[in-house]
Regions:
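Active-site segments of SGNH/GDSL-like serine hydrolases
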Residues: 121-124, 137-183
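Short, hydrophobic/glycine-enriched beta-strand segments
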Residues: 2-8
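Catalytic His-Asp segment of secreted/periplasmic serine-dependent ester chemistry enzymes
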Residues: 160-256
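A structural motif corresponding to the C-terminal end of an alpha-helix
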Residues: 36-43, 130, 136-155, 188-206, ...
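Conserved SGNH/GDSL esterase-like catalytic core that processes O-acyl groups on lipids
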Residues: 2, 19-129, 136
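Short, solvent-exposed beta-strand-terminating loops
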Residues: 88-105, 158-165, 209-216
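Short, amphipathic alpha-helical "lid/cap" segments that border enzyme active or binding sites
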Residues: 73, 131, 135, 139, ...
Length: 256
């Protein structure tokens, strides 16, 4: 079996060690690697932290001067049996706005907040047009993956739940309106995956539904809380090692 993995940081695992590709901020313990190990499969891991649907479909992702990744879809082998996709959060500016708000709350004078501020001046509201556009883009990736590998089973893997109904960060006191805005983005992302699966006929593994009790602030979290260390802060509100293991396990079940 050959698996090709597409996606952004929720698939890549930006701060999990060991590191598979430093420029891509990709871990060798992310869910694609764990899935391949569990199934005894070969893996082409194309995930890159910070990816958008555009950098998966048709635009190079520039990491730094002289460092870039071609559109991920171009790397899908024609012989792939399974293609997984977890992306879209960056298109909605979900985690980026959450991290920026966390820094503003945690330490308004911190340099990190000033660095992130121009990119994320506020928490965006997901209007119907934006959600529809994201749904269409996810469906386009499914079509493109099938074009690259006609026999592949394309699987949409949505996002682990970051904020459950009663979630509270232990380090950041988000305002109720901020939490509501983040949940609106989270709900929009889940809906886009659900509708894209229906529209494209791709399989959906809804890890969001299975992780409601493992959100930030839970007894057994599958996502990190805010990480105030600037060297590791990119891992804030991202899957933990346990979260990646859980996603891989759900995929193993879903692929049977």
């Amino acid at each position: 079996m050959l698996i090709a993995a597409l996606g952004s940081s929720f698939a890549a695992g930006p701060t999990l060690k060991p590191v598979a590709d430093r420029a891509a901020m990709r871990s060798s313990l992310n869910y694609p690697h764990r899935l391949a190990t569990a199934l005894g499969a070969d893996l082409v891991d194309l995930t890159v932290s910070g990816a958008t649907i555009g950098t998966i479909l048709d635009t190079a992702q520039v990491i730094a001067p002289g460092v870039q990744f071609p559109p991920q879809i171009d790397g899908v082998p024609p012989t792939a049996d399974v293609v997984t996709l977890t992306a879209g959060g960056n298109d909605l500016r979900f985690i980026g706005s959450m991290l920026t708000t966390a820094w503003r709350r945690y330490d308004p004078s911190a340099r990190m907040g000033a660095l992130l501020g121009p990119q994320y001046p506020g928490i965006p509201a997901p209007d119907p047009e934006t959600i529809e556009a994201l749904t269409g883009l996810l469906a386009r990736v499914v079509t493109a993956a099938r074009r690259r590998s006609p026999r592949a089973r394309v699987v949409l893997v949505d996002y682990l739940t970051v904020l459950g109904p009663g979630s509270r960060s232990s380090l950041v006191d988000f305002a109720p309106a901020e939490l509501a805005a983040f949940r609106a983005l989270q709900d929009a992302l889940e809906g886009a995956f659900r509708d894209a699966a229906t529209r494209s006929g791709a399989q959906l593994v809804a890890v969001s539904e299975r992780s409601r009790d493992h959100a930030v602030g839970s007894a057994d979290p599958w996502v990190e809380d805010f990480v105030p260390d600037p060297r590791r802060t990119v891992g804030s509100f991202h899957p933990t090692a346990a979260g990646m293991a859980a996603v891989a396990e759900l995929l193993v079940t879903g692929l049977r």
